[in-house]
A protein has these predicted regions:
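ABC family nucleotide-binding domain
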Residues: 1-167
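Conserved beta-strand-loop-alpha-helix hinge in the C-terminal portion
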Residues: 170-186
Length: 186
């Protein structure tokens, strides 16, 4: 996830993002790529504890230079998509684990990234909320967003169009073998 998200650079091989080798990008360019192109959903949420859910969602928009009025509107729309617009003013300590995860997901998608990286996005969610998140990811993917989900949950992985198994940093299997259930039906 760190290499795909441009947090770390590869020590071997070449990672090409938007037609450019990432290792050739200067730090300022990498920052711009992370800010404008990639949305991150971290396993441990990474929410700012003293800020409201809405303020946490709007954080990437501050760095992108979006006006306060537009930030609020975009943040509320993102919270609405994850079913938490009624919790916009709540601090993280007032939210359940599943609600915190959905705030983190809203923050990851608020800047309309081309690439969404999600580390165990359903791990803290009940089955209903987890299903809603996966449906949201599917909707984002259908609209052109590349969604990469890192998971140990086979049922979550089976919803993917493509599955890559990685063990100790090495790709061991790749393809649709565990496959998309919709593909299996056809």
């Amino acid at each position: 996830m760190n290499i795909v998200g441009c947090l770390d650079l590869p020590t071997s091989g070449t990672y090409i993002l938007d037609g450019r080798p990432v290792s050739e990008l200067k730090e300022k360019e990498l920052t711009r790529v992370r800010r404008d192109t990639i949305g991150f959903v971290f396993q441990n949420f990474q929410l700012m504890p003293r800020e409201s859910a809405l303020d946490n969602v709007c954080l990437p928009l501050i760095y992108a230079g979006v006006s306060k009025k537009d930030r609020r509107q975009m943040g509320m729309e993102a919270l609405e998509r994850v079913g938490l617009s009624d919790r916009a003013d709540f601090k993280p300590t007032q939210l359940s684990g599943g609600q915190k995860q959905r705030v983190a997901i809203a923050r990851a998608m608020v800047n309309h990234p081309k690439l969404l990286l999600a580390d165990e996005p359903t791990g803290a969610l009940d089955s209903k909320s987890g299903k809603q998140v996966l449906e949201l990811f599917e909707s984002l993917n259908e609209s052109g967003v590349t969604v990469v989900v890192i998971t140990h949950d086979r049922k979550v992985a089976e919803q993917a169009k493509r599955i890559v198994h990685i063990i100790d940093g090495e790709i061991t299997e790749e393809g649709q073998e565990a496959g998309n259930e919709k593909e299996k039906e056809n």
